[in-house]
Amino acid sequence: VFTVTLSARDLGRGLKTTLRISWRILLGEDTLRTEDILNVIEKEGDTIAVVMFGGVQFYTGQLFDMHAITKAGHRKGCFVGFDCAHAVGNVELKLHDWGVDFACWCSYKYLNSGAGGLGGAFIHEKHKDTIKPALLGWWGHDLKTRFQMNNVMELQSGVSGFRLSNQPILLVCPLQASLEVFNMTSMQALRRKSVLLTGYLEYLIKHYYTEDPAQPHKPYIRIITPSDPQQRGCQLSLSFSIPIRRVFQELERRGVACDMREPSVLRVAPTPLYNSFSDVHRFIETLGKALASSSS
């Protein structure tokens, strides 16, 4: 939102004009329906210049149908882009094949580079000679003539022209190490394991911590992430019947690293690259102890 707001300001347009489409989640539901997204694009598309979504929604963990959204946007003449921060390294991405116009992402989530790690960007090759950067840097200059120092910019085509300067070596090293591990397998294999791993977590949560009318005082958990594996990545977003901060603190005290998001969600993401099914089982056992302590 901040980036879009800044871009709109630089173009001399107000936020109200730029972010004019508001989404409403249906009563009793926690996520957006794909058909509703496509219907809005079809209805409003003639007034929309750019459609921009998250690949995976950070709060709910919902994986959007990027291919369908891209096709719908293109039918109305819109540019379509995605923030893939929670998608890269998590789900299979075929940005080029889907015809996505542009995308960006960070590397400190599923790519394991650490907080503040390098970002990444994608521009479809069909735009390589038409989309130009607003901010120029010498690293975007053609390598063959970069050091001639003639003060005439010879911009590299595509996303390479958006580079500004040297990569910081201390940030490159952890990312390179992580990508070398990724190269030992494939996203297809990781995704297959991920579906099973998160499915196992979902099964155990529903088995042990679903609301039980016969035990009205027992804490329970509601999963707000879609149950369909095709509409989620690793992450399950959990909503609790008791104050979430206490649960988070009890888990943290027991050595479990989760993520709390206000107002009421705990994000849990068993990651196939380094988590196991036994990790998931231990988490469920620890979660039970944390719930017991939190509600006592």
Kindly label every feature range from the protein language model.
Residues 1-296:
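Pyridoxal 5′-phosphate
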